Amino acid sequence: RSRGLGDVYKRQLMNNMNKRTFLSLLLCVCCLSFLHAERVDMQQAGADVQGRKLNTALINSTIDRLNAHGGGTLFFPAGTYLTGSIHMKSNITLELEAGATLKFSENFDDFLPYVEVRHEGIMMKSFQPLIYAVDAENITIKGEGTLDGQGKAWWTEFFRVLVDLRDNGKRNINKYQPM
């Protein structure tokens, strides 16, 4: 039985409508996924904003929770947030408002246990970096806030160890890396 032009036209129209419907649904799903991404105000979540108490556990547990739900943003309003190593995961944003400071601890114990890192092309075990990620993607750090790595404490210890090694020939140079 032969088909008329009307049948062919109806079939093409249905195919085009199915494609448009599919693309419209896909666009809606994409938009909804962005709307669903949670934004956590770290001050409201209970973080100390005076820089006196460590917020490491709260920051990292918030990252874990957001990551388990597909991602989100940790928002740091103005204040000082003392922390150890921050373990980033996929689809996480750290947003620091102007006047917000992530102040990394001067206590080396807050960057343990050692993790595998690359230094000048050589893989080694060392302290956890200030912000650390493994097998993660779509990570963002944004805003007008400050990341304060407390570099003076780290350089002071580094040079103390070098001087001890040079002057005294010590091999067990600190409690972290006995040689």
Model-predicted segments: where are they?
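Bacterial Sec-dependent N-terminal signal peptides
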Residues: R11-V40
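Extracellular/periplasmic carbohydrate-active domains that bind, remodel
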Residues: C30, F34-M179
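Small/flexible residues
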Residues: R3-L5, T21-F22, N168
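Single conserved hydrophobic/aromatic residue that forms the stacking wall/gate
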Residues: R1-Q12
